Amino acid sequence: MKYYITLSALILVLFSCHKKDSKIDGPSLEDLNGQFSVLSPLAASIDSVDFASGETVYFTALFSKTSEWNLKITGLVSGAVKTMTGTSNELKASSSLWSGETTNLPIFKNENCKVELTFANEPDTLIAYVKIIQAKVNSGFLISDFENGFNSGWTSFIQSGANMNFQVLSDASSPQGNKYYNMAGTVNWDWLIGLVNFKSTAYGGAPAFPLNANPNSVYFNVMIYGESGTTNSIVLFQFEEDENGDGIFTAASEDMYAKEIKVDWVGWKLISVKYSDLVNLVNGVPAAPNGNGVHDSDKIKTINMLHLANPNSGFAKSKLDYIIFTENGPLVP
């Protein structure tokens, strides 16, 4: 009897150790040692796409083994770049769908795009092309992209310093469209170099900007360019709230929230901030607001854009473009 019990226990142990699933963990031998080859070339699902109307495009390709891949889409006019990465033996809609957004500024234009598929461990480069008929449209309230110049409803102040240049310029460096606002100069007696006031009345005479009343849903976005060798610029945005609705901002009794941006990078960069995260600043230091202390995003009457620099730091320069409020999330250009 003891013999049979021992034998039964041994059989039970053997069966319990048997691997029920024949699937092999980790990469297959084909993926490890097999020769890489392209089974189906890179292709776009459509050869031209209208992102403005909601169209999308995706890319397909098939290779002989699982590989790390990088898909790069480059605008041949704008220089905009969108990248996607993955690890698989196939490129398909679920991994390569494109809605017209960019990974690196600038924003894509109406243009032809070159699509390149490369692999981490293979020399192959697959190429295709797709045409953007209409570029992606970003929803939100646009303060300015400067394509129509300087709005007559705005006001400005520019110090009488040296090499002052506050104006709308047009050149290929613009991250969106063809124009941007240039702010540059040397002021050796004051932090302020110049400013622009964006007034709500410049947009159809409205007493306040038409924004969601929930400050957690409102995002302020701006693209800022930092000049090489002049990383001393500070851009300060101030948001004046007309809390009592009398048509006037009263600094002593109403809130003004702010966002200070030290431009210490080179090139274009998108800055996004949720309105409820803004604070009141006094000489760059957070302080209690003077009004009700509530972020009334639907009561913003004026947005002030100041260009600042330490007066001992010399010439300062920044470029700004595509100032826009978005809802429920930051701008995805």
Question: Model regions: which residues?
Answer:
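C-terminal motif of bacterial Sec signal peptides marking the signal peptidase cleavage site
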Residues: V13-S16
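Short carbohydrate-recognition loop motifs
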Residues: F166-S200
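Beta-strand-rich interaction surfaces with strong enrichment in secreted/lumenal proteins
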Residues: M84-S88, T103-L105, G205-N212, Y257-D264, ...
